[in-house]
């Protein structure tokens, strides 16, 4: 049985994505994501940057890649215990390793060049086909016009 307190249900237009949270690797990031999910912060936010064969990035309330929550930045929680593979959920940040806030990305494919350089806080366990269906961006930036949205994101323990 899954640990419902450390499981997220992300509803997309095509269906549910289940994400196992990894508090053993990134306790502060997991706590932040759960807090924001419980506030409804992610509901209606978009996947603003989506690069084919790499990742889908979301969690920015402005939809531009420059926004975040009002909870401030988080210190990096890097690990070498686990690498970036298909379905890994990582914390997006600026060039400053201690600048993560609310944005995250989900990997379409392995990306070993990210290992130990970005915080891993989750792993998709169901619904990766729905992640694969997210609208892709154009050009090298991956910025998406008319992007797909997160319908809702909830902690499984709260989803009746």
Where are these regions (language model features)?
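Cyclophilin-like peptidyl-prolyl cis-trans isomerases
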Residues: 1-160
């Amino acid at each position: 049985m899954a640990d419902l307190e450390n499981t997220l249900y992300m509803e997309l237009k095509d269906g549910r994505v289940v994400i196992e949270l990894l508090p053993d690797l990134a306790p502060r990031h997991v706590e932040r994501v759960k807090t924001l999910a419980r506030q409804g912060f992610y509901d209606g936010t978009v996947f603003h940057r989506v690069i084919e064969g790499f990742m889908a990035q979301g969690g920015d309330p402005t939809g531009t890649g420059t926004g975040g929550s009002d909870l401030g930045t988080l210190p990096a929680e890097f690990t070498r215990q686990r690498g970036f593979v298909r379905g890994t959920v990582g914390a997006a940040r600026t060039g400053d390793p201690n600048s993560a806030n609310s944005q995250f990305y989900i990997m379409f494919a392995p990306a070993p060049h990210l290992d130990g350089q970005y915080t891993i806080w989750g792993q998709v366990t169901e619904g990766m086909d729905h992640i694969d269906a997210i609208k892709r961006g154009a050009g090298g930036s991956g910025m998406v016009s008319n992007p797909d949205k997160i319908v809702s994101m909830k902690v499984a323990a709260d989803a009746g």
